[in-house]
Amino acid sequence: MEIGHVYEMPPMRPDDAHTTYFPAGVIKIGVEFRDLTPEALVEYYGGDEDYVEELRRTAPLGIEDRGVSLHVFDADGHWEYLRFDLFEDAPHYHYNHLGGGRNHIIPFDETAHGPIADWAVAKIRSGELAPMLAQAGGAELAARLDPKALATAADDVAAHAADLQARLAASA
């Protein structure tokens, strides 16, 4: 059974000018603040109003939200395999399947799992990131994850994400 929603278009890449990257061995993790709006999606996807309308129609929790995103790339930054969106209204995560535009978005249940920020950092810190990477087509990376590098990166990612979230809360 597949949960969530699959879009056949690639996800929005992070804005490198506003993303801080933390190396973690064979992967790197980007931390970015995002303000997701229909207008931002239209601008990113070249004015494809049909795609934005599909998002409005099919996204169960809407597409206007903001918060911190954690981007999990291969170390060279060629492919974003996973993304954890620590959003205010509709936290969720993505499997961005290697080699295509398949973008699988899964709503996050904070009642069952606690705050998504804690859950996402725990996934990065632990071996539980490996099956998620494999699911997104990164089995080779998953097999080569370095637990020490992940632990160090997880601490840095958690601190930077908390700082961005605090700034977000202060601006509300």
Residue positions per predicted region:
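Conserved aromatic-histidine-acidic binding/catalytic patches
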Residues: 58-62, 112, 145
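An exposed acidic His-Trp-rich patch
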Residues: 79-139
